[in-house]
Amino acid sequence: MRITLVGMGSGAPGGLTVRGLAALQGAGLIIGARRLLQNLPDGCTDNRTALYKTDEICALLQGAGCEQAAVVFSGDTGFYSGAGALCRALDAAGTPYTVEPGVSSVQL
């Protein structure tokens, strides 16, 4: 499975990059905080699960059974975000992933 951690900046679709949008639109499963899932742009799967705890996200990803999954985060995925904890957990499990940062508040 290909896993992408997608930054959504402030949480609005305008905080997505082109690559982040492509990852979301190609995903068969999208995981994240409820408010982020409610703000996903058109063309994204309806297979969405509202989770934010790292251990719960990892468990769901392990049993997902889809080719591509995305986990959405607000904030800056490289600085202050839950993405850091998930990266550490995926690294510890030997699970490959990519990170697509969103538009951060510093850039706005």
Language-model segments: residues:
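Class I S-adenosyl-L-methionine
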Residues: 1-108
